[in-house]
Amino acid sequence: CLVGSEMCIRDSVGAEIRLAGKRVQVTAVSGPRNATATVLDALPGTDATGDWDESAFSAARGWPVTACFHQARLVLGGSRDLPNQLWLSRSGDLGDFDPGTGLDDEGIAFALMSDQVNAIRGVFSGRHLQVFTSGAEWMVTGDPLTPASIQLSRQTRIGSPVDRMIPPVDVDGSTVFAARSGRAVHEFAYTDVADAYQSNDLALVARHIVVQPVSMAYD
């Protein structure tokens, strides 16, 4: 998956970028807008150009924080440089994240935008695509998910730990996740009456049991 920008390329030595849609591999950087590269695909010309894009994931930019499969798409959540971004692959083609022209089966990329920081800490495929961030829990809907139908809505404001990864788990149809506070475990459950998710504190009557959990499992 690719992100187009005019960002500095000083940390991109060894990375592949695209110039006018053609691949080159950066071998040296001499300035914020100047680099030497090995041509991997024949270029249309040799003139300077601002038409370039860089891989969203690399040693320079960071790697996906979390992943899951949902509706025949691979879902990647967050990275070091793009902590609130979601990427969904092409339907049925888990390695193709190209958004193309926005056709129903093509790749999808979007950011969680709100009034607070939302670094993605987990994604989970349940009744809907669920996204767990450092500050809230979200529901991604669309039947099926397409670039035109996708909708994103914040459900609750509990938050997940930022200093360690604790993947959420399915427990009898509900999603259980560790709270950012380190003193609670919540059940993220959908209610038909409210047509929304609720986060119920499962440690409410035994707070002393939960102290900075590091992993969860359910059998």
Stretch-by-stretch model annotation:
Residues S5, G31-A42:
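A generic structural motif
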Residues C1-I9:
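Short, small-residue-biased leader/transition segments that mark boundaries at the very start
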Residues R10-A35:
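Ser/Thr/Gly-rich low-complexity blocks that favor extended beta-strand/coil architectures
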Residues R10-D11, L43-D47:
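Short, surface-exposed beta-strand/loop "edge" segments at domain boundaries and coil↔beta transitions
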Residues D47-D219:
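Beta-propeller and closely related beta-pinwheel folds
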Residues V24, G31, A42-P44, D81, ...:
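Generic "edge-of-domain/loop-turn" microfeature
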